[in-house]
Swiss-Prot record:
Family indicated by similarity: Belongs to the phosphatidylserine decarboxylase family. PSD-B subfamily. Prokaryotic type I sub-subfamily.
Domain of life: Bacteria
Post-translational modification: Is synthesized initially as an inactive proenzyme. Formation of the active enzyme involves a self-maturation process in which the active site pyruvoyl group is generated from an internal serine residue via an autocatalytic post-translational modification. Two non-identical subunits are generated from the proenzyme in this reaction, and the pyruvate is formed at the N-terminus of the alpha chain, which is derived from the carboxyl end of the proenzyme.
Enzyme class: lyase
Membrane topology classification: Peripheral membrane protein
Keyword annotations: Cell membrane, Decarboxylase, Lipid biosynthesis, Lipid metabolism, Lyase, Membrane, Phospholipid biosynthesis, Phospholipid metabolism, Pyruvate, Zymogen
Annotated catalysed reactions: a 1,2-diacyl-sn-glycero-3-phospho-L-serine + H(+) = a 1,2-diacyl-sn-glycero-3-phosphoethanolamine + CO2
Protein name: Phosphatidylserine decarboxylase proenzyme
NCBIfam families attached to this UniProt entry: PS_decarb
In-chain residues carrying the UniProt-annotated modification Pyruvic acid (Ser): S254
Gene: psd
Length: 289
């Protein structure tokens, strides 16, 4: 590891993650025209954001930076894979890793893995259906479309907010911060689907001001403590989302991890670490019995 990378990793442990994220979140919600227009224009240039596919192409039309960052796309900008039974990629970005969940652990990077149960908030019961299953980790870069969509149609069963740190998420931290995704703040969404249980985990990172879902809005428990929200109780109307429907969004980006049970899916042979992906592309197909 280079000296520059060592310095970067050391800074990750020393910086006040949540304070920085709150300050950046405040700036991202600022509506002052002189500020938000300059910030959005700089960001679009810096990261070469393609606004031709956005519903609103005019950078100055966004009320604040977060509205720009979570911008909607034009109809048809992300066609859904048509293969029978296709499991869709949940987001734009790049595959960080994908493969089997072995011995209750998920591969992070060379020399590093993390606990499936810890990713899901330390709940062995929640983790049990995914033991021996498969995972895919999608990293969303700053220039990407930052809404997350359903890989399969499903009925929401449970949502778990898991407090944690906010380490930056990139190749350097993945290779050098142990248990990165099981340490960062995250929201776990559990669904019942035609392929059995499916989890979509929205992982925060440094400067990720908030995580939002379409059914709960901003997921911000008053105290930073683990909190479970159940949606399969008789008193609640079922929440069902169709394949390709928006699930949630990052107000400043990070990572989405999708989990499946054993013998349910076979990943697209053309995908591997660092493969670029777009929401709606074929991530996997049903595994043949």
């Amino acid at each position: 590891m280079s000296f520059k990378d060592r310095l970067f990793i050391c800074s990750q442990y020393l910086l006040p993650h949540h304070l920085l994220s709150r300050l950046i979140g405040f700036a991202a919600d600022c509506r002052a025209t002189w500020f938000k227009d300059r910030l959005i224009a700089w960001f679009a240039r810096r990261y070469q954001v393609d606004m031709r596919e956005a519903q609103v192409e005019d950078l100055q039309a966004y009320e604040h930076f977060n509205a720009f960052f979570t911008r909607a796309l034009k109809d048809g900008a992300r066609p859904l894979a048509q293969e029978p039974g296709a499991v869709l990629c949940p987001a734009d970005g790049a595959i960080s890793q994908l493969g089997p969940i072995e011995h209750g652990r998920i591969f992070q990077a060379k020399g590093h893995s993390y606990s499936l149960a810890e990713l899901l908030g330390g709940d062995a019961e929640l983790a049990a259906p995914f033991m021996g299953g498969d995972f895919a980790t999608v990293y969303l870069s700053p220039r990407d479309y930052h809404r997350v969509h359903m890989p399969l149609a499903g009925t929401l069963r449970e949502m778990v907010y898991v407090p944690g740190r906010l380490f930056s998420v990139n190749q350097t931290t993945a290779e050098n911060v142990p248990e990165l995704f099981a340490r960062n703040e995250r929201v776990v969404c559990l669904f019942d689907t035609e392929r059995g249980p499916m989890a979509v985990v929205l992982v925060g990172a440094m400067i990720v001001a908030s995580i939002e879902t379409v059914w709960a809005g901003l997921v911000t428990p008053p105290k930073r403590e683990l909190k479970t929200f159940r949606y399969d109780e008789a008193a609640r109307a079922p929440i069902r989302l169709e394949k390709g429907a928006e699930l949630g969004r990052f107000k400043l980006g990070s990572t989405a991890i999708v989990l499946f049970g054993p013998q349910q899916v076979a990943f697209n042979d053309g995908l591997g670490a660092a493969s670029p992906v777009r929401m709606g592309e074929c991530l996997a197909l049903p595994k043949q019995a």
